[in-house]
Design a protein with these regions (language model features):
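Conserved Class I SAM-dependent methyltransferase catalytic core
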Residues: 245-308
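Conserved AdoMet
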Residues: 34-113
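C-terminal beta-strand of the catalytic ATP-binding
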Residues: 219, 308-311
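Residue-level signal for inorganic ion chemistry
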Residues: 35, 73, 103, 152, ...
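Non-catalytic accessory regions of SAM-dependent methyltransferases
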Residues: 1-47, 53-55
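Conserved SAM/SAH cofactor-binding pocket of Class I
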Residues: 105-227
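Mobile active-site "lid"/loop adjacent to the S-adenosyl-L-methionine
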Residues: 219-250
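Class I S-adenosylmethionine-dependent transferase superfamily signal
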Residues: 110, 156, 232, 254-258
Length: 311
């Protein structure tokens, strides 16, 4: 991509696709469009109606940097610094698990199990035109265990205005990023980030007080971790991936405490490895949970365990 050449969007896009193909990118066209969109501020559709527009020097410099990073295998989400998650956009950063679309199903299943009232029925318009939440909307107390970027905690709080979420993680990098996302999304009054080894940072007087504990813990079996694609193994922290021999090490550890911190009838929803949901089902039943079910992810694989504390 020489500086003295005229580079239109189409020419730069074609060059980027070819470069990424040679670097072994599995989806070079998708990657090229994503990078071009980030560099120009145009949507992927807008790129195609602006094929003949020349790139500015600044856009070319940004694109050149992005393409070089992608050529080294850096995930697109880290290059752009953000990722959409359900109805929000969250910041991402190195050494923190990148949110995946599959995890959106975890939030959907948790909401479905709780059978919450329609938020729209409890929203009124204030004197200055602002939205006002009715005090009749039931409060929802939530723990997001292994919060990572905070995508789950922030998503729940943004979608349900009466939710108060405690977001827990042990990794300093994750805690810092989660706090940034809470502030960026204006959720500081309803999402509290705490450093914690599993549920250890919850207070004794909080036992029996939570409606929902939701978690995307490290759940990849160790042997599977060793064979993960480079884009995952080199950029997502091992701490956020490796769940031990069968992927259930942390799940087994926090089950008893989850039972004690939930209200009677409270919900536990956990994303887990597709091959070991049956074992997780048995673990939950043995720990005293009931009404346990398994939900599939977007690809039809078993992914989420949902269960309840007895009433």
């Amino acid at each position: 991509m020489a500086d003295n050449d005229m580079w239109t969007i189409k020419a730069a896009l074609d060059w980027t696709v070819g470069f990424l193909e040679r670097k072994g990118d599995e989806n070079p066209r998708l990657s090229a469009e994503w990078l071009m969109s980030e560099a120009t501020g145009l949507s992927r559709i807008e790129l195609y109606v602006n094929f003949d527009r020349p790139l500015t020097l600044d856009e070319r410099a940004v694109l050149r940097d992005f393409v070089a990073r992608r050529g080294k295998g850096e995930p697109l989400q880290l290059i752009s610094g953000k990722v959409p998650f359900r109805y929000i956009t969250v910041l991402v950063a190195p050494n923190v698990l990148i949110p995946r679309p599959e995890t959106e199903v975890l939030v959907s299943e948790a909401f479905a199990e709780l059978k919450l009232p329609r938020v729209a029925d409890h929203i009124a318009t204030g004197e200055n035109g602002e939205e006002v939440v009715s005090p009749e909307l039931p409060e929802l107390r939530v723990v997001d265990l292994c919060t990572g970027s905070g995508c789950i905690a922030c998503s729940i709080a943004s979608e349900y205005p009466a939710a108060h979420v405690v977001a827990l993680d042990i990794a300093p990098e994750a805690l810092a990023l989660a706090e940034k996302n809470v502030v960026a999304l204006g959720l500081g009054d309803r999402v509290e980030v705490r450093g914690s080894d599993l549920l250890g940072a919850l207070d004794h007087d909080e036992k029996g007080s939570f409606d929902l504990i939701v978690s995307n813990p490290p759940y990849v079996p160790t042997k599977v971790c060793d064979g993960l694609p480079r884009e995952v193994s080199e950029w997502d922290p091992r701490l956020a991936l490796d769940g031990g021999e069968d992927g259930l090490d942390l799940f087994r550890r926090f089950l008893p405490d989850a039972l004690s911190y939930l209200k009677p009838g409270g919900v536990l929803a956990v994303e887990l490895f597709e091959g070991h949901l049956d074992q997780a089902f048995s673990c939950a039943c043995d720990a005293g949970f009931e009404q346990t079910r398994i939900a599939q992810d977007l690809t039809g694989r078993p992914r989420v365990l949902v269960t309840r504390k007895p009433r």
